[in-house]
Amino acid sequence: MPSASSPRARLAALAVAALAAAPLAASAQPKAARGRTEVTWYGHAAFVVTTPGGTVLAIDPWLSNPKAPEPGLAGKLPKVDYILVSHGHFDHVGDAVALAKRTGAKLITNFDLGSSLVAAGYPKDQAGMDTLGNIGGTIQAGDAAVTMVTAVHSSGYADDKGTAHPGGNPMGFVIQVKGGPTLYHTGDTDLTQDMKQLPERFGRVDVMLTCIGGHFTMDPKAAAIAVGYVRPRTVVPMHFGTFPAIAGTPEELRAALKGKAEVRVLEPGKPVGF
């Protein structure tokens, strides 16, 4: 056996030290500058966004809608950190209260609607001043910054007994993911001139989740004009086909865009990376 001071012993000691240090070096490596953000559509206007840092955002979580991929989703999602509600209508508030009670998710919406949802059972300690705001405000949600932006619609909230409550102003959401994409969820809205300002304020929008159904919101032709204002890389249509009245289709959107943007129709329940 070589002595501790021999060259062979010193080389062996160095090799062992290098092997021991290797896992530490690997774990200290920074994450990629642009990680994978997963977007899952659950039908209608309901989406779940999972960031590279593991933050989970549920947007307009009507998870029991007719286009949902399976029943009982509000009781099955393993983790939700924040629930974003664009306005007070039942098809956007959806299962927010039940989901919040089960997951502990904090509420991001306007202050008036937030107060009404707390009265309806949303846990008060999950709907505080740190996450309730109004149009123009930005909320830090883990590794995502959520800015509330203009939408033209209504926002009355009715509880389970049909009693009307304040719903504040309707809104869309611009979600800037650290190390990931910038997403724009239009909420329910008509075409607005404010959309022209989004690229100036937020830079390139990577993914625009846009209503196209018509009747209550933009139809495909109006949505195509909105896409021209926002200039996203990818357009994901939503809020169509759930009811007979919202009859706009992705095919009509593609035709109206004339190849000016990629239209990507998501399959309910299937995550897609951006």
From Swiss-Prot:
InterPro entries on file: Metallo-B-lactamas, RibonucZ/Hydroxyglut_hydro, UPF0173, UPF0173_UPF0282_UlaG_hydrolase
Protein keywords: Hydrolase
Molecular function terms, GO-annotated: hydrolase activity
SUPFAM superfamilies referenced in this protein's UniProt entry, alphabetically: Metallo-hydrolase/oxidoreductase
Pfam families documented for this protein: Lactamase_B_3 (PF13483)
Claim: Hydrolase is one of the keywords in the record: yes
SMART domains attached to this UniProt entry: Lactamase_B
NCBIfam families xref list: PRK00685.1
Family from the record: Belongs to the UPF0173 family.
Protein's name according to its UniProt entry: UPF0173 metal-dependent hydrolase A2cp1_1196
Organism: Anaeromyxobacter dehalogenans (strain 2CP-1 / ATCC BAA-258)
